[in-house]
A protein has these predicted regions:
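Alpha-helical scaffold within the catalytic cores of cyclic-nucleotide enzymes
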Residues: 88-89, 120-138
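A short glycine-enriched loop-to-beta-strand structural element that forms part of the catalytic core
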Residues: 112-114, 140-155
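Conserved nucleotide-binding and Mg2+-coordinating catalytic segments in signaling enzymes
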Residues: 29-49, 63-77, 85
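Signal-transducing coiled-coil linker helices
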Residues: 2-37, 44-59
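Short helix/loop segment flanking the catalytic signature motif in cyclic-nucleotide metabolism enzymes
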Residues: 83, 110-128
Length: 155
């Protein structure tokens, strides 16, 4: 759709400034559509629209925060939000720009790692799990995070 708008000449519908404003708004809406409001990572809709039927080789991992309900019940929902944010920041530090972290909902994330061989994939998942376990949740020094991770390579 954005490409179609860019193809319009200055005489059609609006001037070039108006067209640029429209393109900017559409980009902003697209960003909102595909981003999780709490964590800022991609959301389930992004996965369903952009990734699910992709035909590239990659590693795909599920990351699930262990005992998330307990964190919320013990420390409050703010602490749960901070735990999710800590996981996102930790995973992002461990991954490449081409990798995609997607929040499927609640405490479940999907990590898509394009062009990843088995040895590096396994090492990367272990690194992520270890880094999350060592991570400090800001404002909650007694909270220790643990995640369950499982993955598969696609061909």
């Amino acid at each position: 759709m954005i490409e179609m708008i860019n193809r319009l000449d200055d005489e059609t519908l609006m001037d070039s400034e108006g067209r640029q404003n429209l393109v900017s708004k559409l980009n902003s809406y697209s960003e909102e559509l595909y981003r999780d409001a709490l964590t800022g990572v991609f959301n389930r809709r992004y996965f369903e629209d952009q990734i699910r039927d992709a035909s590239f080789c990659c590693g795909v991992a599920m990351i699930d925060l262990d005992d998330f309900k307990l964190y919320n019940d013990t420390y409050g929902h703010n602490a749960g939000d901070m735990a999710l944010d800590t996981i996102v920041k930790t995973v992002n530090r461990c991954t490449r720009r081409t990798d995609r972290l997607i929040r499927l909902g609640g405490d479940e994330f999907l990590l898509v790692l394009p062009e990843m061989d088995e040895e590096n994939f396994v090492q990367k998942l272990k690194q992520i799990q270890s880094q999350i376990h060592e991570a400090q949740v800001p404002g909650y020094s007694k909270m220790r995070l643990s995640v369950s991770v499982g993955g598969v390579l696609t061909r």
